């Protein structure tokens, strides 16, 4: 039952991305939504909430818990420092985004390697068909692999 809130927030994140893409065009990366919405804090707040809701679930599921922690804290810092074009926030944002993606992927590999393989294949196909938004597709696939791994492990438990 604890997985309902994180999955709801994940679905909300995808909905916000889809609505933004429909109205403004597909962003080159998820973080671009912050600037595209006039520096609205909606997406950063959702990312922080998503990270904090996934943390206890990921820790309970096992795997390498330090990777689960780094994944969620990285995503929380991405949301906490959304102004990646600002000199003061750029290094925090960029480092946190890289940390969240790498740690999330490694955590998923320790839990459900097949999910990572499918997500990587999807990212490659999306990147080849939409080269301008390659980073966006990699981010969506990385975030989705974590969500799918959480759902699969929760249902299997």
What are these regions (language model features)?
Residues 57-61, 80-87, 127-132, 154-156:
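Juxtamembrane "helix-exit" motif on the non-cytosolic side of transmembrane helices
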Residues 112-157:
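Terminal transmembrane helical module of multi-pass membrane proteins
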Residues 5-7, 37-49, 94-101, 115-120, ...:
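Alpha-helical transmembrane segments of polytopic membrane proteins
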Residues 1-61:
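N-terminal topogenic module of multi-pass integral membrane proteins
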Residues 14-19, 81-83, 152:
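C-terminal TM-helix exit segments that contain a strictly Trp-centered aromatic cap at the helix terminus
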Residues 65-119:
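Membrane-proximal helix-loop-helix units in multi-pass membrane proteins
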Residues 1-4, 55-66, 106-115, 155-157:
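Helix-coil boundary and interhelical linker segments in multi-pass alpha-helical membrane proteins
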